[in-house]
Amino acid sequence: MKYDLIIIGSGSVGAAAGYYATRAGLNVLMTDAHMPPHQHGSHHGDTRLIRHAYGEGEKYVPLVLRAQTLWDELSRHNEDDPIFVRSGVINLGPADSAFLANVAHSAEQWQLNVEKLDAQGIMARWPEIRVPDNYIGLFETDSGFLRSELAIKTWIQLAKEAGCAQLFNCPVTAIRHDDDGVTIETADGEYQAKKAIVCAGTWVKDLLPELPVQPVRKVFAWYQADGRYSVKNKFPAFTGELPNGDQYYGFPAENDALKIGKHNGGQVIHSADERVPFAEVVSDGSEAFPFLRNVLPGIGCCLYGAACTYDNSPDEDFIIDTLPGHDNTLLITGLSGHGFKFASVLGEIAADFAQDKKSDFDLTPFRLSRFQ
């Protein structure tokens, strides 16, 4: 059988692509080296932020607004356990923060619902938060967080119900191109398709070593917290920048545990074996202490944590482009630790590519040619 589309990597983007392409009537094969959702990539750990007024640059805003529409649609499949939780996101940092300036600019350009608070206003709204006098907060009332593993599980189930073929726990070992399309090699045999999507995450260079993607080991952890820090008490998700420039992110507490991680830093790795479990690097359990001590002093001890991997591009912007010399293969990689919120729209973009549809978005900033 020759498929219309083969998807290599069925984590966040691949799961979405499999669903949207199958829903569009294509004959699709989803593949993954493991059984998604799993612990080997970048999507585990229960939750991921979704922010609309984007501190990484306004080029992302049209994408994230479409992503939000698709997340809302997906959430309707799980109304008892919603995939998207509109908790709001408070972005904290010094008044001269470049990141916050980008957030404010994005909000102004796209007329997003963002409220600016000074230090006293932040602490009056959320007494659990402490910030210096020179800090400001930009509160995105319509943003929140996503249940990442539930989202992937839902997409995979919906795709399967729609007739999508799925080959999991079976790594793709090679990709070949010829006049007839794309062929992948696996331990289960060879499979052919007219087109392919490569969204293999951290270890995409095992297949395409020429790509400018660097895996980085990252950790996040859950800390003891009480009901004051919960969604029920209107405690928001958050990003926070310390005076030294370190960037943190976190979520409202669930079951008396608040999850937090540090966005920058981490350990450069070159193989999956180097991504050692949480606590095997001395700094893992204390990485969030500078933020917690200064901004959330009421949070208790570290309960447990996990390690994941970022697939960083050189400029930490996404790579969305066809494979050089092969216009029938789309790459979606280099998501650099801020990609999950876009998984829905990136999956839709992949499905449009498979149908020869022109994208509704300007993807020029994400081309590989910027690294030449």
UniProtKB/Swiss-Prot annotation:
Class in the EC hierarchy, top level: oxidoreductase
Sequence positions that bind FAD: 4-34
Cofactor binding note from Swiss-Prot or TrEMBL: Binds 1 FAD per subunit.
Modified residues (S-8alpha-FAD cysteine): C308
GO CC field: cytosol
HAMAP family hit by this protein: MTOX
Complex and partners: Monomer.
Family: Belongs to the MSOX/MTOX family. MTOX subfamily.
Name of protein: N-methyl-L-tryptophan oxidase
Lineage summary: Bacteria, Pseudomonadati, Pseudomonadota, Gammaproteobacteria, Enterobacterales
Gene expressing this chain: solA
